[in-house]
């Protein structure tokens, strides 16, 4: 499956990020887990339709 990116079963995580995004205050969110489980893809998927000037992502 090289070259194919699958993004499934992340509805709960995306809803959590959306709730935090819509709060009118600063938040620090630490996303952790085993390697190669889709942490970076989750953040990219969440941010793809957001109008932001800058985002810092450390992997």
UniProtKB/Swiss-Prot annotation:
Annotated residues for binding of ATP: 33-40
Gene Ontology molecular function: ATP binding
Superkingdom of source: Archaea
Parts of the chain that traverse the membrane: none
Record-linked InterPro entries: ATPase_dom, P-loop_NTPase
Keyword ATP-binding: yes
Annotated keywords: ATP-binding, Nucleotide-binding
PANTHER family: ATPASE
Protein name: Uncharacterized ATP-binding protein MJ0423
Organism: Methanocaldococcus jannaschii (strain ATCC 43067 / DSM 2661 / JAL-1 / JCM 10045 / NBRC 100440)
């Amino acid at each position: 499956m090289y070259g194919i990116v699958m993004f499934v079963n992340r509805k709960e995580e995306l809803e959590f990020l959306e709730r935090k995004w819509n709060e009118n205050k600063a938040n620090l969110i630490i996303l952790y887990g085993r390697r190669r489980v889709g942490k970076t893809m989750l953040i990219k998927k969440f941010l793809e339709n957001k109008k932001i000037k800058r985002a810092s992502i450390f992997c």
